[in-house]
Amino acid sequence: MAAFHVVIPARHASSRLPGKPLADIAGKPMVVRVLEQARRAGAASVWVATDHPEVLDAVRAAGGDALMTREDHPSGTDRLAEVVDALGWKADDIVVNVQGDEPLIEPKLIAAVAQALADDPVAAIATAAHPLHAAAELFNPNVVKVVCDAHDHALYFSRAPIPWARDAFATARDDIPAGLPVLRHVGLYAYRVAFLRCYASLAPSPLEQWEALEQLRALWHGHRIRVMTVAVAPAAGVDTPEDLERVRAAFDRHERVG
């Protein structure tokens, strides 16, 4: 298995769920639940990058490693770049960005995306996707789709329905035609440290700004993104109070069974 580090960006502010990293899930803060899952992935180290002292204290109280980072980062990728510089990781090291609101993330998925990047020397980034079967999701702009080339490198990410079945969608849009390779992007990324160090110097692209998808900056500037396809959709993260209750219920069920 490839050696890799994990960084968990955990911003305290959230428009829909203030103080989200500290939300209680079965007796532990959400960020600690994510930390525990990441530790099970076999990473060389796991760090939480936060902008709030309460999150820092919660992670350290749980025996985790955490860093205070700037509050004004425009994206999670920029926050990762600050972390890799602070910790002095080598240019060819691999770093997996695990979102701080993914307490149900599978450790094996974290390890797999790191391995996908390690196995692809021409890629700067690796990410994941899964087959999408519902037409309602294909046409939902909140669902990000990705199309790939023959080597599993991303050609484009979009909120629009891609690829477009010209003839089938001309008459009906209730179903996805059989064989249409529709993939839903999963927001899990592995990066080479060398790419993270140059990311901040890359000018934002018009496509990135129109789509509001920061990974398009990498494609715009010619960097390759390896897409690892998984058969089943990973568990969703926490964006709303309703999501939080769903995750709490999942942990309660697990603890009753376990």
UniProtKB/Swiss-Prot annotation:
One of its GO terms (molecular function) is 3-deoxy-manno-octulosonate cytidylyltransferase activity. Pathway: Nucleotide-sugar biosynthesis; CMP-3-deoxy-D-manno-octulosonate biosynthesis; CMP-3-deoxy-D-manno-octulosonate from 3-deoxy-D-manno-octulosonate and CTP: step 1/1; Bacterial outer membrane biogenesis; lipopolysaccharide biosynthesis. It is found in: Cytoplasm. CDD domains: CMP-KDO-Synthetase (cd02517). One of its GO terms (biological process) is CMP-keto-3-deoxy-D-manno-octulosonic acid biosynthetic process. Its EC number is 2.7.7.38. It comes from the Bacteria. It is an enzyme of class 2 (transferase). Keywords: Cytoplasm, Lipopolysaccharide biosynthesis, Nucleotidyltransferase, Transferase. InterPro entries: Cytidylyl_trans, KdsB, Nucleotide-diphossugar_trans. Gene3D superfamilies: Spore Coat Polysaccharide Biosynthesis Protein SpsA, Chain A. One of its GO terms (cellular component) is cytosol. It catalyses: 3-deoxy-alpha-D-manno-oct-2-ulosonate + CTP = CMP-3-deoxy-beta-D-manno-octulosonate + diphosphate. Activates KDO (a required 8-carbon sugar) for incorporation into bacterial lipopolysaccharide in Gram-negative bacteria. Belongs to the KdsB family. This is 3-deoxy-manno-octulosonate cytidylyltransferase. The lineage of its organism: Bacteria, Pseudomonadati, Pseudomonadota, Betaproteobacteria, Rhodocyclales.
